[in-house]
């Protein structure tokens, strides 16, 4: 069963995300620095009747990269074609996509860091010269033919910018870091989404959902749908603070946006390992979750929020973790020191 607070896209998100997506850049909530830069670059490109420079969007999942790509395509009056790194297995697959593009179209490649090298090399002349180099024949008889491509924009999206090769990364003219949303921005998103869904919600109810959404619009919209279900069954015409809080408690999403496993990890470190340090393999065995799942799914948000600290000796629970669980930290260790980045 998938976690309701996962930032990754779930099957149920598909149709609702399409209906909730803003269509213009001025309708897009949050990411103000990214919006301002893109707005200027888009207007400049349109004035010169040129394609927008290739754009790389990087940051955690669920923050609106696909939505931004859709907006850019509309602002440039082009069509959006969506694919992903894992879906493009051979160079011929990418060549087939590139040859269907028209001027000002946008090609969006999600998880672009997962492109294999032979496919990636096809992109180099396509991005630099709007050209596609095709080799015909084999051996001594082989010859290369260059096909002209339309003036398109490539938008790459990645959650792991460090995994991109330098030649690919350097070919993007615009790099945009997507950041987590604050509660005020998420509250606006929840209120807007509620209007699209046709349900009424108070500002307090929207803020309660926003505060448990882990800084991620995708999670906020998913929680709103479940709170709406709860409110309708309880015959409440408006989602108030009480309805939102009761529904989220039923879903076992606490006031930090943590679910059962998040809290289980904190409890294990504090109650069973005296606050740490504890090795990730030991922790994995103790809570019954795969090591990779802890590192990729659960740990990043706990690190980002400062509830655990990663050190060379293992994971340590911070003072925030003790306070969150209502425990007293009697251990004389400085839990605020250590490696807090989950990108290393």
Swiss-Prot record:
One of its GO terms (molecular function) is ATP binding. It comes from the Bacteria. It catalyses: ATP + H2O = ADP + phosphate + H(+). Keywords: ATP-binding, Cytoplasm, DNA damage, DNA recombination, DNA repair, DNA-binding, Hydrolase, Nucleotide-binding. InterPro entries: AAA+_ATPase (IPR003593), AAA_lid_4 (IPR041445), DNA_helicase_Holl-junc_RuvB (IPR004605), P-loop_NTPase (IPR027417), RuvB-like_N (IPR008824), RuvB_C (IPR008823), WH-like_DNA-bd_sf (IPR036388), WH_DNA-bd_sf (IPR036390). It is found in: Cytoplasm. Residues 182-252 are annotated as: Small ATPAse domain (RuvB-S). Its EC number is 3.6.4.-. One of its GO terms (cellular component) is Holliday junction resolvase complex. DNA binds at residues 310, 315. It holds the Pfam family RuvB_C. Residues 255-344 are annotated as: Head domain (RuvB-H). Residues 1-181 are annotated as: Large ATPase domain (RuvB-L). One of its GO terms (biological process) is DNA recombination. CDD domains: AAA. It is an enzyme of class 3 (hydrolase). Mg(2+) binds at residue 66. ATP binds at residues 20-21, 62, 65-67, 128-130, 171, 181, 218. The RuvA-RuvB-RuvC complex processes Holliday junction (HJ) DNA during genetic recombination and DNA repair, while the RuvA-RuvB complex plays an important role in the rescue of blocked DNA replication forks via replication fork reversal (RFR). RuvA specifically binds to HJ cruciform DNA, conferring on it an open structure. The RuvB hexamer acts as an ATP-dependent pump, pulling dsDNA into and through the RuvAB complex. RuvB forms 2 homohexamers on either side of HJ DNA bound by 1 or 2 RuvA tetramers; 4 subunits per hexamer contact DNA at a time. Belongs to the RuvB family. Has 3 domains, the large (RuvB-L) and small ATPase (RuvB-S) domains and the C-terminal head (RuvB-H) domain. The head domain binds DNA, while the ATPase domains jointly bind ATP, ADP or are empty depending on the state of the subunit in the translocation cycle. During a single DNA translocation step the structure of each domain remains the same, but their relative positions change. Homohexamer. Forms an RuvA(8)-RuvB(12)-Holliday junction (HJ) complex. HJ DNA is sandwiched between 2 RuvA tetramers; dsDNA enters through RuvA and exits via RuvB. An RuvB hexamer assembles on each DNA strand where it exits the tetramer. Each RuvB hexamer is contacted by two RuvA subunits (via domain III) on 2 adjacent RuvB subunits; this complex drives branch migration. In the full resolvosome a probable DNA-RuvA(4)-RuvB(12)-RuvC(2) complex forms which resolves the HJ. This is Holliday junction branch migration complex subunit RuvB.
């Amino acid at each position: 069963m998938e976690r309701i607070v996962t930032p990754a896209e779930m099957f149920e998100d598909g149709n609702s995300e399409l209906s909730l997506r803003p269509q213009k850049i001025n309708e897009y909530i949050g990411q103000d620095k990214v919006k301002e830069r893109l707005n200027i670059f888009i207007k400049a490109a349109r004035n010169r009747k040129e394609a927008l420079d290739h754009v790389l969007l990087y940051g955690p999942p669920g923050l609106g990269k696909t939505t931004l790509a859709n907006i850019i395509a509309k602002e440039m009056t082009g069509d959006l074609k969506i694919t992903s790194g894992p879906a493009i297995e051979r160079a011929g697959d990418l060549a087939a996509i590139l040859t269907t593009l028209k001027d000002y179209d946008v090609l969006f490649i999600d998880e672009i860091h997962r492109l294999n090298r032979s496919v990636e090399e096809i992109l180099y002349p396509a991005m630099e010269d709007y050209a596609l180099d095709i080799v015909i024949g084999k051996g001594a008889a082989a010859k290369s033919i260059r096909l002209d491509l339309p003036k398109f924009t490539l938008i790459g999206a990645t959650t792991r910018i460090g995994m991109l090769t330098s030649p690919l990364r350097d070919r993007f003219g615009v790099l945009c870091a997507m950041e987590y949303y604050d509660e005020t921005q998420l509250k606006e998103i929840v209120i807007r989404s509620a209007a699209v869904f046709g349900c009424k919600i108070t500002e307090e109810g929207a803020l309660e959902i926003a505060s448990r959404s882990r800084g991620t619009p995708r999670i906020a919209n998913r929680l709103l749908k479940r709170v709406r279900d709860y409110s309708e069954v309880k015959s409440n015409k408006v989602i108030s603070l009480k309805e939102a809080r009761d529904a989220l408690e039923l879903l076992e999403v606490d006031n930090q946006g943590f679910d059962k496993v998040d809290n289980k990890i904190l409890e294990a470190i504090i109650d069973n390992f005296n606050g740490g340090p504890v090795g990730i393999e030991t922790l994995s065995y103790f809570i019954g979750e795969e090591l990779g799942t802890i590192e990729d799914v659960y740990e990043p948000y706990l690190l980002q929020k400062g509830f655990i600290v990663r050190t060379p000796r293992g994971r340590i629970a911070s003072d925030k973790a003790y306070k969150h669980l209502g425990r007293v930290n009697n251990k004389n260790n400085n839990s605020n020191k250590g490696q807090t980045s989950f990108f290393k």
